[in-house]
Amino acid sequence: MTNTTTDEIRVMTSGAFTAAYLELIPQLELLIKKKLVTAATSIGTGENSIPNRLRRGEPVDVVIVADAVLVGFIKDGLIMGDSHTPLARSAIGMAVRAGAPKPDLGTVAALKRTLLEAKSIAHSASVSGDYLTTELVQRLGIADQVLSKTRLIGHGERVGAVIARGEAEIGFQQISELLPVAGIDHVTPLPAEVQKIAVFSAGVAASTTNPEAARAIVRFLGSPEAARAITDSGLEPIAPLKLSSAG
């Protein structure tokens, strides 16, 4: 499949980078003098996940996903290897419904207690959810007690939205995906000893019909000019923040 018009650049981004990317759209459109068409979705296994959309041959120019996933796309010939650009580091956090009691996450022991005491736990269908269910609870020695209480949130829905509706007591996702959601509180990172930092990267699709504009987008997202929006979204930019020369 090919893009219907070269006046549009299509971007697929996973949830963790979405808030920063949306903030930067006006600058990006000014830079490339084209309209951006965005699909904000997950890197899970659902029908509309980024991996499945790419493999179906949906038109796309730029892809933003967890670094390990992007490397896999490069190996599969879906992304141009020389366009691989790390953008930001992302931490996993926990949230509760606004007004609910705020569990302690200050230590590993406190996190373990919070997981054991929670009646229901929501997690994403991507990096943070995989870590919670396949590594963290095993490392804490509580998999048997906790996994039966977990609920996978798929189809591109934010974990925070499920928490805000009261459908789960606590939820885990990338902090940058929790922060924009109304109706939740106490967005708190995991303790450093058990935190899993994910790097999110961008690349140009091998099928792009406008490689020049696509590469310009990737370069800008990885530059100091994009760092403020990345920081404000709850991520840590790879590129250093561009300091103002004023004053």
Task: Annotate the PLM regions.
Residues 64:
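Phosphate-/polyanion-interacting regions in eukaryotic proteins
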Residues 81-83:
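Central helical "cap/lid" subdomain
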Residues 1-39, 43-48, 52-59, 67-68, ...:
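Exported/periplasmic ABC-transporter solute-binding proteins
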